[in-house]
């Protein structure tokens, strides 16, 4: 190694002042001085454990010492008698070996491949030792888990990502999936547990042993979110459950993740071979699979958007030409051809890269450049992380750490290092673009006429604009010129750097050319300039519109069609990323896939970072709303489908919010102890109104009530034990808080919980029994009407079944027809007096006579009136299907049901489109006269006449 650079020699004096007496400067070797100057992590470790430094001096690290890790750790654990001792010894062992690896890495005593191998095998050794110790302890406590034949069942652990590939970085978390082979029960314990319970409890203890911070630190941060169904799925799955999931529901991204999956520990046993054989067909297709390229391109686009969202710069992993792009390049060949070429099925990147070159899938030169770049980037990444044992891939901005990295990478200074780094990343980006880059390369438009540039630069006199804007009226021409001038004045007030000005000067002539070709140029330009004012200081978004002409065209057409979309994009410019791919922009997520999409989206956010979780939920919702609105405008979604999508989206949000609130409450108070005897969480969220009726609009709030079914004496099992009814109350309060907290991306939804028993004066959470009693003995008729449009939107099967039974029972109560008719009619008249249209010569689509609410009251009245005789009327909670049921059960003539359905969907469609135009829900008095007359006639027939 070359001598320390001048800044590092100065820093050495600071290090000397920190060292305790046993580590006096004169006693240290030259190598020790180099390593202690480079790594604060090593400094802190040897100050706490001076004997480790003596061991390093007397027994320097060797390339093959990973082969001794298991024996060394076994010796360290030989006297451990409890979990606390296990946790302590694992943490100390990990830190001691990491110091040795950092020493070898800093001094370049071994190759980078050897460093990656040592880091990965250390993690595997610690994971397997912890698992084996806990398995024995759990078997002593609960008995040995066995299958039906009495054969002991092991816990198998899949190491994912870089751990599975033997390429773990210095400060990495570990992605794991737990599995066991066959169902059965424990044998030899004090009481019998089924295998699922045994392995779930053991898995929880294993995560705690590895992940929980103590005074000795932690072993590894454990991430279990790659398992089937993510954090909402079982912690441990049987082989059969794993196989069912990956065959029926496995997603592309899970397939890519599984490429690197490796069984920790003994990987040659019968069960290990069975698991591997089961997973292989999911990962490697028998046919050549070119769909991989587009899927990986989409994943790369997601990563690029994430980099922009989080403002990541100088990131050697996720940035252009970074480590992730090399991984993608290799995975393309593995996933396209791995089913046909077993040699491509390696988990490790470098061996696979050699195979790709040997198969002539790309040039030897490209393979060599990628190999050199990968080793350079991985060494830089590991050195960066070993400074403070910190999980980062972002290059430092401070002079000390820059000097450290330049020295350790064998460069004279930082500019030399970054010059070589840039060259490597440029090579990677070139290969990546050739292989995975967008295959729909945009043909550049012919250069714009000088007039458009002059129009933007304010170099045209008003008379000179006539040829450019000839198709516009004189008033529109003047308005366009005024908008451009006002926009330029607004720019002068903003701090825009030279790069931003340059991008704007390239973008605006293109934008003006497209906008001014439209008949509605003035209106469209006013919406777009309002949006641009909000993003001019964020060059990334300007570059997006400048570099992707298709995105600019989508922006113009959407803003022209809907001021709501224009406002949404202006408030949340992150949504501009959605314009890049028309396949997703105009094709909303499948209605049954919102939960899965959201789960994948949240995987990118630290589970324990509430602020980022809240932000991610809101960003996901805004992006999905944009897609739904775009499809609505394009005419690809009819009104019923718009509401279906908005409702499924809301349910996915409810699911995620309840999950987040539950995790937080359990962490604070423990789990309700009555759940040990039953499946689920003993908690349900019931949706009323538009949510319950599958009829949400773009700005609808959520009408929710919360139910639980805990016994009176139940308590939580945490250290801060509380009554379970109090637990569920705090859970509901937390849910309300998570929905209503305002972040930079707004609130999630307005939530109204006043439909609960006794309204705002009642308890926020009601027991299932109290809810049933209230509905039977105290509820008003209007509350029974509301129940017609109610359904469980989150809840375990037991509580859902209970609510459904109560709902059916209440709706099917015998009612005196005349009394019911009077009560429903009088309630409607009160509402109309209170909420009806106050605008002269206008028709309020929802509240006025002949409008949507009249149709809703007709269906609710008929269900309550006839469900006693026709129980099937209680099946659905949405008006359209209720009208179908009324016709099918001979309550209403089929023609009348069809007429009301058509009127209902027509009026709702108009409300959706008014919302897209940011207009109130009323129209001219002479609109929809035919529909209103038909609704009035039906109202008269059912709710007025005898």
Curated annotation (Swiss-Prot):
InterPro entries, A to Z: GlnE (IPR023057), GlnE_rpt_dom (IPR005190), NT_sf (IPR043519), PII_UdlTrfase/GS_AdlTrfase (IPR013546)
Pfam families from the UniProt entry: GlnD_UR_UTase, GlnE
Protein purpose: Involved in the regulation of glutamine synthetase GlnA, a key enzyme in the process to assimilate ammonia. When cellular nitrogen levels are high, the C-terminal adenylyl transferase (AT) inactivates GlnA by covalent transfer of an adenylyl group from ATP to specific tyrosine residue of GlnA, thus reducing its activity. Conversely, when nitrogen levels are low, the N-terminal adenylyl removase (AR) activates GlnA by removing the adenylyl group by phosphorolysis, increasing its activity.
Disulfide bonds: none
Organism encoding this protein: Shigella dysenteriae serotype 1 (strain Sd197)
Highest taxon listed in the record's lineage: Bacteria
Enzyme class: transferase
Residue ranges, annotated region (Adenylyl removase): 1-440
Enzyme Commission identifier(s): 2.7.7.89, 2.7.7.42
One GO cellular component term: cytosol
Protein name: Bifunctional glutamine synthetase adenylyltransferase/adenylyl-removing enzyme
One GO BP: regulation of glutamine family amino acid metabolic process
Transmembrane annotation, as ranges: none
Annotated keywords: ATP-binding, Magnesium, Multifunctional enzyme, Nucleotide-binding, Nucleotidyltransferase, Transferase
Cofactor(s) annotated in UniProt: Mg(2+)
Family per similarity comment: Belongs to the GlnE family.
Reactions it catalyzes: [glutamine synthetase]-O(4)-(5'-adenylyl)-L-tyrosine + phosphate = [glutamine synthetase]-L-tyrosine + ADP; [glutamine synthetase]-L-tyrosine + ATP = [glutamine synthetase]-O(4)-(5'-adenylyl)-L-tyrosine + diphosphate
GO MF entries: [glutamate-ammonia-ligase] adenylyltransferase activity; [glutamine synthetase]-adenylyl-L-tyrosine phosphorylase activity; ATP binding; magnesium ion binding
Segments of this protein annotated with the region Adenylyl transferase: 449-946
